[in-house]
Amino acid sequence: MAKVSKRMKEISAKINAEKKYPVSEAFDLLREVSSVKFVESVDVSVALGVDPRKSDQVVRGASVLPNGTGKTVRVAVFAKGPAADAAKEAGAEVVGMEDLADEVKKGNMDFDVVIASPDSMRVVGQLGQILGPKGLMPNPKVGTVTMDVAKAVRDAKAGQVRYRVDKAGIIHTTIGKVNFTSDALKQNLERLLTDLKKAKPAVSKGIYLKKVSVSSTMGPGINVDFSDLNI
């Protein structure tokens, strides 16, 4: 317990919870306070000026980060015929229809993303209670139900992140790893915030991007001054 307390004291001495740090300085701080034996992810939280209790203010979507996330993504695709062939060529690990659905029902789900062609939804629709709770259910709003399954596979492999505003009006996602360069993390953050601005509900009034903070997997949140970003 004393060890944890000592670490937290060291972190508190380096990070001012009330300050908004320039982006590059924030990423440098993440590395300074990282003391675990694995390469941590860099997570971001964005507080939005929306009321998620209202259906027309629910912000959800996907963003393809220019420098990826640093994670290896395994993709499963529900498709048949030429679409199935295209998905395999694009790099999908698992492609199928009823046979893939049977594997899902058995609990064999060694994949991180599920993509479906529109004509496969009659099969995928039966798997909602299994895929839904795991955040794997395909949805056209985030591009995982699509005619162009090959592009969706490539996007997933390239570092696409999906997001949905929570009950507090906050988006949580990842933008890379602590061993990324600060420039790479900055570019990823800029792409995410740009896409979030594009997803702003028409009925949202006042300040939309209210607060941005970054953190490593095991680290504290660091408030970011995003006013000088190219968004």
UniProtKB/Swiss-Prot annotation:
Recorded GO MF terms: rRNA binding; structural constituent of ribosome; tRNA binding
Functional summary from the UniProt entry: Binds directly to 23S rRNA. The L1 stalk is quite mobile in the ribosome, and is involved in E site tRNA release. Protein L1 is also a translational repressor protein, it controls the translation of the L11 operon by binding to its mRNA.
Transmembrane segments: none
Assembly and interaction partners: Part of the 50S ribosomal subunit.
Gene that this sequence comes from: rplA
Disulphide connectivity of cysteines: none
HAMAP family the record matches: Ribosomal_uL1_B
Pfam family, one: Ribosomal_L1
Entries under NCBIfam families matching the protein: rplA_bact
GO biological process, alphabetically ordered: regulation of translation; translation
Organism whose genome encodes this protein: Francisella tularensis subsp. tularensis (strain WY96-3418)
Name of protein: Large ribosomal subunit protein uL1
Similarity comment text for this entry: Belongs to the universal ribosomal protein uL1 family.
Gene3D superfamilies, per the entry: 3.30.190.20, 3.40.50.790
Keyword annotations from UniProtKB, A to Z: Repressor, Ribonucleoprotein, Ribosomal protein, RNA-binding, rRNA-binding, Translation regulation, tRNA-binding
GO cellular component: cytosolic large ribosomal subunit
